């Protein structure tokens, strides 16, 4: 209330004719009137807006803190999931290497076995064919070679199908590795 009285008395001293008349009138000095209005508006904003603004800031701060904590939790969860998936990938790659090594070992054993059987078969045919002419011997040897090759391929294919038949991912990895060994892109 003291501020109002001060402003009123200051206004009266600026206009002595109004003070003598004993009343108030409009103040036409724009700068002086704006200053008074600004002081009143700022005072009202501070008085009434303090609670609203403080409450808004508290709510906003809580929302930001919640968002940050959720983001941190999501980041930790994602890091844990990534570690698990990398571990699973490493295990799958190790298993694929084992399967490939076993397949190669079995294929080489099958090849050696087929070659040994072919040698004994060739020897048997040579012994039996010594009575035939040399032309019939050559035909028989060529035929045996063809059969042995066909048998070897069938045996290797059967062994690979037995080992890799139910494991599509191992088949896919074996094919990709074979293509890579040949210089292709998978």
UniProtKB/Swiss-Prot annotation:
Short name of any one Pfam family annotated for the protein: ATP-synt_B
GO MF terms held by the record: proton-transporting ATP synthase activity, rotational mechanism
Membrane topology qualifier: Single-pass membrane protein
Function: F(1)F(0) ATP synthase produces ATP from ADP in the presence of a proton or sodium gradient. F-type ATPases consist of two structural domains, F(1) containing the extramembraneous catalytic core and F(0) containing the membrane proton channel, linked together by a central stalk and a peripheral stalk. During catalysis, ATP synthesis in the catalytic domain of F(1) is coupled via a rotary mechanism of the central stalk subunits to proton translocation. Component of the F(0) channel, it forms part of the peripheral stalk, linking F(1) to F(0).
Keyword Signal in record: no
Domain of life: Bacteria
Similarity comment text for this entry: Belongs to the ATPase B chain family.
Keywords per UniProt: ATP synthesis, CF(0), Hydrogen ion transport, Ion transport, Membrane, Thylakoid, Transmembrane, Transmembrane helix, Transport
Lineage: Bacteria, Bacillati, Cyanobacteriota, Cyanophyceae, Acaryochloridales
Protein name: ATP synthase subunit b 1
Compartment(s): Cellular thylakoid membrane
Entry's transmembrane regions: 28-48
